[in-house]
UniProtKB/Swiss-Prot annotation:
Region spans: Disordered: 577-604, 632-695
Alphabetical list of InterPro entries matching this protein: TTvirus_Unk
Recorded superkingdom: Viruses
Biased composition regions of type Low complexity, renumbered to the chain: 676-685
Sequence ranges of Basic and acidic residues compositional bias: 649-666
Annotated function: Self assemble to form an icosahedral capsid.
Protein name, entry field: Capsid protein
Record-linked Pfam families: TT_ORF1 (PF02956)
Subcellular location: Virion
Coiled coil: none
GO CC annotations on file: T=1 icosahedral viral capsid
């Protein structure tokens, strides 16, 4: 009989699952032991050891230096407040990928797509209060009677779209300005090359993952953690968000297309000297006839019949006959063999004059039907801009030609985005009154060069509109391109400054952008290429770049949730509210209704009009407090008009700001006392003709105003520094 304590113990073993195969057991790898740097010792022989000096043992407790206690004044009342809300960072309508959503967030669109596929958005306390007025966020605590504030950062949660991918970049370091390179750097192909970016893949691109991405952003880099007045930090830019829609599954072209090259049309050389919309056609009638109307091959399009059926006469039908040697006869009207179906003998005499007269009749009819009568339309001087028979009408610029080998008044361009190196590319805007297509320093505006075309056109219209301050910019300017990376090249080696004017396919077909066939009467009287009819070309060029979203959905939205953390502080006076206990608000459930938080506009929550504990003496307001409140202006209670541009949009340098900077630099350079007489003499010699006395007085007045503004700004900064509430100027938006 074996003793039970000597029996071999049963050892537990892991068994194979009954209906599954063996799987390797996951073992957590232990972190390697940190190597200890040992002291190098001297080896001695046996029987020898190192002698140590004997020290007397100290009695008592060791004393340490006292740490200095740094104290900072804190307000009596401190309340933590979270501002939580939801906001669409991007709402991208169909075929609006290259537009800036932040610039069009407050638009009123009756019909058609809305928004844009990119955004450059900023956050500030004023913007958060504006969102509160729109019932888009909540404040967990009121800021009423608490005039101080501290900012601690925010959390941004991005929710993934089912089918559309996005790229987001968040910045909290200045400068916070929109420049000519902001749009190109927001292109998906450029953002994918950035180191610090946030990819928001769609549920289709990356399934079985969390449906949201959370990011923690701290205060701005130049922002000090201390108490500020809410008025001072009301306009401080807390963070900026740059986002764009993209395609992470098919970055280099959709699988539904044959290739990633695009084609568009540009005006031919016949329009080089006829591009101005203020051209008098009666004075330049001979040039217009010889360049446009007398060109018989220009009428060989599929739209000529619908536009000029009653203005142009056809030749009698002739057959293509073959001679005995197999050659074709030269006198025929079959366009497949280079013929012309129209009566070519009458073009220089009867037909051209009939077309011009028809254009004048159309303008007279348009002027009659416009109520009230529009005196700006003159049929005698604007007949060349008429919709049906003008020099930019569909019979001359439509892409569908009866014989593609017979060239018209335009040029077909093919663009390969993968061949674009950027060097030599130029894009700029010219006024419609400019008489040529050349780049002229001073007259040509908003130049972007040495960038790929697919990046240069990204957000270009919104940048130009923002910088110019003209809401009708797309009606007053045209876009001109230079690019040696197209086929044929949009570059003239004999004249490197000459540009080319592109136009959309719908404009060439006589349609509105988007393909609508009805053209308003006012546009029929002024039918010529400008930015409004060039947007789709720039959209197509931008969408040809890598990682670009190609408008597969009617509307794509990037939804976000933000949570800003503030601390309100102050020394308010306790208000005792006494209600009538005998008069209720109606019903037993009145106290169960949710109470709304009273939020005050941070712009007017100033220390000057806020009541503090030290403003009351023996139950009465002090004289200083009464005088201080009387000097302040009352806050407007009436509803103000909405801002001209969205507040969430990042501001840019306007033309006035750029000119002011140039003038300030020039004038400061002129008044520098350390400049040598030789430099001053050289500048005077290079200056233009002598200015008049009136111009000199105006320049001196402008210089004095500029110096006064700079001195006032300096004194304000000194005062803010003395109050320990100085804010770095780069964190403030431009006025």
């Amino acid at each position: 009989m074996a003793w039970p304590w000597r029996r071999r113990r049963w050892r537990w073993r892991r068994r194979r699952p009954r209906w599954r195969r063996w799987r390797r057991r996951r073992t957590w790898r232990r972190r390697p032991r940190r190597a200890v740097r040992r002291r190098r010792v001297r080896r001695r022989g046996r029987g020898w050891r190192r002698l140590y000096r004997r020290y007397r043992r100290r009695r008592g407790r060791r004393t340490y230096k006292k740490k200095p206690v740094l104290t900072q004044w804190q307000p009596t009342v401190r309340r933590r407040c979270f501002i939580i809300g939801y906001m669409p960072l991007i709402i991208c309508g169909e075929n609006l990928t290259s537009k800036n959503y932040a610039s069009h967030a407050d638009d009123f669109v009756k019909d058609g797509p809305f928004g844009g596929g990119m955004t450059t958005m900023q956050f500030s306390l004023r913007i958060l209060y504006d969102e509160f007025l729109r019932f888009l966020n909540i404040w967990t605590h009121s800021n009423q009677d608490l005039d101080l504030a501290r900012y601690h950062g925010f959390k941004l949660t991005l929710y993934r779209h089912p089918t559309v991918d996005f790229i987001v970049i968040i910045r909290n370091s200045p400068p916070f300005e929109d420049t000519e390179l902001t749009g190109p750097n927001t292109h998906p192909g450029m953002l994918m090359l950035r180191h610090k970016k946030i990819l928001v893949p769609s549920l289709r691109t990356r399934p079985s993952r969390r449906h949201k991405i959370t990011v923690r952003i701290g205060p701005p880099k130049l922002f000090e953690d201390k108490w500020y007045s809410q008025t001072d930090i009301c306009d401080v830019i807390l963070a900026t968000v740059y986002a764009t829609a993209c395609d992470l599954q098919y970055p280099f072209g959709s699988p539904l297309t044959e290739n990633y090259c695009i084609s568009f049309q540009v005006l031919g050389s016949a329009y080089n000297n006829l591009i101005s919309n203020t051209l008098n056609p009666n004075e330049e009638q001979q040039d217009i006839k010889s360049a446009i109307y007398n060109n018989v091959n220009a009428y060989l399009t599929r739209i000529t019949e619908s536009h000029m059926a009653n203005l142009i006469s056809k030749a009698p039908p002739k057959q293509v006959l073959k001679s005995s040697d197999g050659s074709l006869q030269t006198d025929h009207n079959d366009t497949q063999f280079g013929g012309n179906p129209y009566n070519t003998n009458q073009f220089t005499t009867t037909t051209v004059n009939k077309i011009i007269q028809g254009a004048q009749n159309y303008l007279t009819t348009i002027k009659t039907h416009l109520q009230p009568n529009n005196s700006a339309i003159n049929p005698n001087t604007q007949w060349h801009l008429e919709y049906h028979a003008g020099i930019y009408s569909a019979p001359f610029l439509s892409a569908g030609r009866l014989n593609p080998e017979i060239k018209g008044l335009y040029t077909d361009i093919t663009y390969n985005p993968m061949m674009d190196k950027g060097t030599g590319n130029k894009i700029w805007c010219d006024s419609l009154t400019k008489a040529d297509m050349k780049y002229t320093e001073g007259r040509s505006k908003y130049l972007i060069e040495n960038l790929p075309l697919w990046a240069a056109v990204w957000g270009y219209l919104d940048y130009c509109t923002k910088t110019s301050g003209d809401a009708a910019f797309h009606y007053n300017y045209r876009v001109t391109l230079i690019s040696p990376y197209t086929s044929p090249m949009l570059f003239n080696p004999q004249d490197p400054t000459k540009g080319f004017v592109p136009y959309s396919l719908n404009f060439g077909l006589g349609k509105m952008p988007g393909g609508k066939g009805y053209v308003p009467l006012r546009m029929r009287a002024n039918w010529y290429p400008y930015f409004f009819h060039q947007q789709k070309v720039l959209e197509a060029i931008g969408m040809s770049g890598p990682f670009t979203y190609r408008s597969d959905e009617k509307k794509a939205v990037l939804t976000s949730r933000y949570k800003f953390k503030f601390t309100w502080g102050g020394n308010p006076v306790s208000h005792q509210v006494v209600r009538n206990p005998c008069k209720g608000t109606g019903g037993a459930s009145a106290s169960r209704k949710p109470r709304s938080v009273q939020v005050t506009d941070p712009k007017y929550n100033t220390p000057e009009i806020t009541t503090h504990t030290w403003d009351i003496r023996r139950g009465w307001f002090g004289k200083r407090f009464i005088d201080r409140v009387q000097q302040q202006q009352a806050s407007p209670e009436l509803l103000a008009d909405p801002p001209k541009r969205p507040r969430k949009e990042i501001k840019g340098l306007t033309e006035a700001d750029q000119e002011a900077e140039k003038d300030s630099g020039l004038r400061l350079r002129q008044v520098q006392p350390w400049m040598s007489s030789q430099e001053t003499q050289s500048e005077q010699e290079s200056a233009p003709e002598e200015q008049t006395v009136e111009q000199q007085l105006r320049n001196q007045l402008h210089t004095q105003q500029l110096l006064g503004f700079q001195l006032r700004s300096l004194m304000y900064q000194v005062q803010q520094t003395h109050r320990n509430s100085f804010i770095h100027p780069l964190l403030l938006p431009r006025a």
